Amino acid sequence: MFRQIPKFSVIRASCFASRCFYSSKSSNATYIASLLAEYDKTTNRSKKPRLKSRNDPKPSFKGAKAKKPDRHINQTGKERDREALKVVLDEVQSKYKSNNAIVILPTGNLEETQLSKTSLTLNLDEHGLQVVGEKKDSKGRSVPLVKVVDRQTAIKNYSDYLHQQVTRKFSSSFRKAINTSNVANKDPWKVIKVSWNISPQDLASQKCNEIEQMLNKGQNVYILIGSKGVINKSIDNPEDLFNEQHKREVSLDDIEALRRQKIVDTLDSMLETLPTSSIGNDGSISDKIIYKIKAQPKKDDKDEKKRLKELKKQERQEKIRLRTEKKRAESKA
């Protein structure tokens, strides 16, 4: 509402600068009014808008710009139709490393062209592509033979592709789990050989510790006690040593019989303290003795079986989901 009035010092300085002095009040008032008018002109002149310069920063606009559609991608049809087309193009590119193809048109005619151009001219609401084979082009090169098919066939092929991917994924996981389980159980029975000539110290420190370690790992164990001629043989199945042709019983004096019996008693005492699910033995101290010891199943084995069962369940659920989705897509088509 009120106009800004210059300070009196500015007005007074202007008076002396013009070498004018007014004695009367009216004359001074007139002169002050003229100074105010001149001040207004100067102020308004300085407030004129400045012309834009090329160095002025460009104004920034908030918000993302709308993304332009890619002119190299077919924009017709639904997203599923475009995904089905992309699978065919990727398959051709990965196998042939080329864009050339021979296309079977809906009319039945063959056209040697670039597959990317053909894909852009398709109306995906009505048609799709399918690789049906391989053919030599005019230059003698092997190129894919691609057929223009109806939309329903293209969607069915895409559903089959997804089903194969899921099956391959779960089969790979299942095979990996099976291989891991097989590696763990590659040698389900370990043969530990003990000579009748072993010293009590070696039996207690070496052989007993070896047996204990195997059983604690969940490893099933054969313990074969015999003469050096028996334990040095290559043995596939220790139980085969106890048929009639392998029996070689010898007469023992009291000292040797007592020593061998002590070895057997030491093993029996040790096995009572170890984690076993079953213990069986056969033979006699006058020939050879075999222990068949089955270890308690480890907790890891149970967890592994549970994981394999869960993988199978997931695979079944995924197959059902894909089958349902495939039927839904075919019904819409």
Swiss-Prot record:
Belongs to the AIM23 family. The keyword Transit peptide applies. Disulfide bonds: none annotated. The keyword Mitochondrion applies. Residues 1-28 form a transit peptide. GO terms for cellular component: mitochondrion. Its main location: mitochondrion. Transmembrane segments: none annotated. Keywords: Mitochondrion, Transit peptide. It is found in: Mitochondrion. Residues 71-80, 297-333 have a biased composition (Basic and acidic residues). Residues 43-80, 296-333 are annotated as: Disordered. Pfam families: mIF3. This is Altered inheritance of mitochondria protein 23, mitochondrial.
